Amino acid sequence: MPELVGEWIGKYHGHFEEVIRINLQDGKWIATKITGDENVPAGEITWRVDPTTCIGEGQIAGQGFLKPSFVPGHLEILSPSRIIFHWEELGQVEYRRDD
């Protein structure tokens, strides 16, 4: 299992770059927003993934964090410093390590 714990920078479609922190909790990689946006604010989970399968779910919400929900997704590990989270039918975000 690659070591993904730490801070990452991602470019969200239509938004500025955002910083997330990945932690390993209860056997899952949990990505929490350090900087947020009008849909999913700082402090909220943006995605969570089973490290053994890279299958998980990403959080979506309307503006103002209305009707938040999780949709299927998966994580693609390109290298130790680049990953992509794919929201099923909603696009993707590429992240790079913030070191």
Where are these regions (language model features)?
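Soluble ligand-binding/transfer domains with enclosed cavities or grooves
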Residues: 1-99
